[in-house]
Amino acid sequence: IACIDDYPGEVSANLLLDRIMGADVVLKKDDGRPEEVQYRELMDRLCKEYESVGEKVYQIPMGGSNLLGMCGYFECAQELTQQSRKNGLKAPKLVCAVGSLGTYMGLYCGLQEADSELCLTGIAISPFGEAKEQRLEEYYAQICSAIGMQKREKAAFHIETAYTRGGYNNPCREVRNAIYLMARQEGILLDPCYTGKAFAGLLDMISEGKIKKGETVIFLHTGGTPGLNTPCHRAEFESELRDGIQVLGERYEKLG
């Protein structure tokens, strides 16, 4: 596992799972250059190191956004289309978090190929600039070429960019409130970086009238719950939730 990041001071959240599974983790301190440049250099160096001792290396990019990962969500979109038709849903909206773009593009192409009635909306969880717009087009062409699908001249990508709330993985009260709502109403855990931020954006879209009362919405949960234990987020959760914890003393336990 290779990341451009500082050591958080403890083995927690994703780092804990990585190490439990036996993965090596390499963290490189940010040197101020574009993160993609640093990441590419780090991955190239690590691949050469492993190959030099006889290892065979398969490189998975950040977010799993390669052709194989995108094809997984291509199939997901087709399965959702089948389920939607089976249940007679009327023009349902499909909403997902958008980070490294692979999930969104796989879904987009899968819906196009299935001539689906689902309308896809992505909610960006980090600033969305020209580089990502260009990468969308590149991923679109890549999938179309790989599966032999007709590439549309003007693809209608719909990604909401107004709900990034200060940037990638930024602790935010509105996101935590969205996490509390989903957990307490549905018993489903969201994470503060991806699904929680996307769900908070979805709630804003409803309050702003972008999604109307009576419309059917499918919110796609893409995982990430270990992020609840990331130190910066856990500290905020603890400060907000501590008042609901009672510690009973020895006298009470004896009377009981």
Residue ranges of each PLM-predicted region?
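Active-site-adjacent helical/loop segments in soluble small-molecule enzymes
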Residues: 154-213
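Alpha-helix C-terminal capping segments
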Residues: 20, 108-115, 201-210
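Small/polar-residue-rich loop-to-helix segments that shape phosphate-bearing ligand pockets
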Residues: 4-87, 150, 155-173, 177-178
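Short beta-strand-loop elements within alpha/beta enzyme cores
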Residues: 55-59, 97, 191
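Residue-level signal for alpha-helix termini/capping positions
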Residues: 51, 85, 112, 184, ...
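Glycine-rich phosphate/pyrophosphate-binding loop at beta-loop-alpha junctions
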Residues: 70-158, 220-256
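Short beta-strand segments
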Residues: 2-4, 28-29, 60-63, 97-98, ...
